Amino acid sequence: EELNRIHDVINIFEDVDTYYSLGEGNTSLIEAGSTLKNYCGSENIFLKNETQNPTWSFKDRGTFSCVCFAKALNESVTATISTGNMGNSTAAYGSRAGLKTAVFLPHYTPEEKISAIGIHGAEIFKIKTDNYSDMKKAILNRAEKLGIRVVSGNGPIRVEGYKSTAFELF
């Protein structure tokens, strides 16, 4: 229902297949506590409770868009580089869409996050690294050579999914 309401402004492709949705969005607003209100000097502060999304993260909004885009391009694989939350979201939505999913994580990623990713059937690659940026560059270069599009936390397709937050506020 939420996707149908905002379809005209999230225009990454003509037809959004809501089958790939896991129920992201339409999260509630929570009134901020007095500490935050006092710190900001305002009595009118509300917070979006994005933990109500399927993988407990705002990233689900963008991942839905990325998965729909991958399906529109007839891709069979989706991949991401993550320290946990993005990997979990990509694994969940990739599974829903029937995509083979690869998640690249630094070796120091907590096991709790790795387990959450694993339950969705993603292929997990733990990379020994001391520098996340270097790891990311190396993976992106390799993925490009293999013809695999890696979804990131700030790509334009992902941002289309984040638009839904603004529309829920108005």
What is the predicted role of each segment?
Residues 1-170:
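PLP-dependent amino-acid enzyme catalytic core
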